[in-house]
């Protein structure tokens, strides 16, 4: 087996990834497949921090667009990420991966509070850490939470697993002539307004020189390929 090129990564999963083809909620077969893929990377010797979105259950941005108070909507979205975190913890432990959930909003009965040094200690002890509740603040996306946590745990890379096989110059679902980038700079992503992550998350990565690899989660084995340094998806650097 190839040696991983990264010792510690931050894996960002969208909430929608857990929903499978049904589009909402949590699909058992889908979450099992994701857990198997994450477990393969873990068993290759990579320390993994994981940030999960909540869009399969609740989208704060969408609710605020319909007139709901944005802060309230965002807090509801944060709680949705915690539901996903617990589901993912269960799925990962079934694959033999020791997992801890830390949340940015305290909920002591179901998860640890987020404490940076404790998170790093878990990683050093080869436990996978799932970070729930985003940053704990409204108006910040889970992409921004991923950038923040990646820097806090000293991850070498953010791996953003999506439903698309990389970054294109326009939406490949709508444009047959869309061109895929193998590599692209942070500033190009911002200038072109490409929907990789929100601009806050990209700017944080740019300021701290943290590379982002975005790739297709729906292809089994892609997470392992990414940590082994195979060229998949798009590198933002």
From Swiss-Prot:
Residues annotated to bind ATP: 12-15, 55, 59, 162, 168, 171
Gene Ontology CC annotation, any one: cytoplasm
Coarse class of the protein's main subcellular location: cytoplasm
Catalytic activity: UMP + ATP = UDP + ADP
Domain of life: Bacteria
Region (Involved in allosteric activation by GTP): 20-25
Pathway annotation from the record: Pyrimidine metabolism; CTP biosynthesis via de novo pathway; UDP from UMP (UMPK route): step 1/1
Keyword annotations from UniProtKB, A to Z: Allosteric enzyme, ATP-binding, Cytoplasm, Kinase, Nucleotide-binding, Pyrimidine biosynthesis, Transferase
UniProt enzyme class: transferase
Cellular compartment(s): Cytoplasm
Regulation: Allosterically activated by GTP. Inhibited by UTP.
Binding site for UMP: 54, 74, 135-142
Pfam families noted in UniProt: AA_kinase
GO biological process: 'de novo' CTP biosynthetic process; UDP biosynthetic process
One GO molecular-function entry: ATP binding
EC number(s) reported in the record: 2.7.4.22
InterPro entries: AceGlu_kinase-like_sf, Asp/Glu/Uridylate_kinase, Uridylate_kinase, Uridylate_kinase_bac
Subunit structure of this chain's protein: Homohexamer.
NCBIfam families: pyrH_bact
Family that this chain belongs to: Belongs to the UMP kinase family.
Function field: Catalyzes the reversible phosphorylation of UMP to UDP.
Protein's UniProt name: Uridylate kinase
Record organism: Bdellovibrio bacteriovorus (strain ATCC 15356 / DSM 50701 / NCIMB 9529 / HD100)
């Amino acid at each position: 087996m190839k040696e991983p090129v990264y010792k510690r990564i931050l894996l960002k999963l969208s909430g929608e990834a857990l929903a499978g083809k049904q589009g909402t909620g949590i699909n058992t077969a889908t979450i099992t497949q994701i857990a198997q893929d994450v477990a393969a990377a873990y068993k290759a010797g990579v320390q993994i921090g994981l940030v999960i979105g909540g869009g399969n259950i609740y989208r704060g941005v969408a609710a605020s667009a319909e007139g709901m108070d944005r802060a309230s909507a965002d807090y509801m979205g944060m709680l949705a990420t915690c539901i996903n975190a617990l589901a993912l913890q269960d799925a990962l432990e079934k694959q033999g991966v020791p997992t801890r959930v830390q949340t940015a909003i305290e909920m002591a009965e179901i998860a640890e509070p987020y404490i940076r040094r404790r998170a790093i200690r878990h990683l050093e002890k080869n436990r996978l850490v799932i970070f729930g509740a985003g940053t704990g603040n409204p108006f910040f996306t889970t992409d921004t939470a991923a950038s923040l946590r990646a820097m806090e745990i000293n991850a070498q890379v953010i791996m953003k697993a999506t439903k698309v096989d990389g970054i294109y110059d326009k939406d490949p679902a709508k444009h047959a002539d869309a061109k895929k980038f193998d590599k692209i700079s942070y500033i190009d992503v911002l200038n072109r307004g490409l929907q990789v992550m929100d601009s806050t998350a990209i700017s944080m990565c740019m300021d701290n020189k943290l590379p982002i690899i975005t790739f297709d989660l729906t292809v089994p084995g892609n997470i392992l390929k990414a940590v082994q340094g195979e060229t998949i998806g798009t590198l933002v650097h």
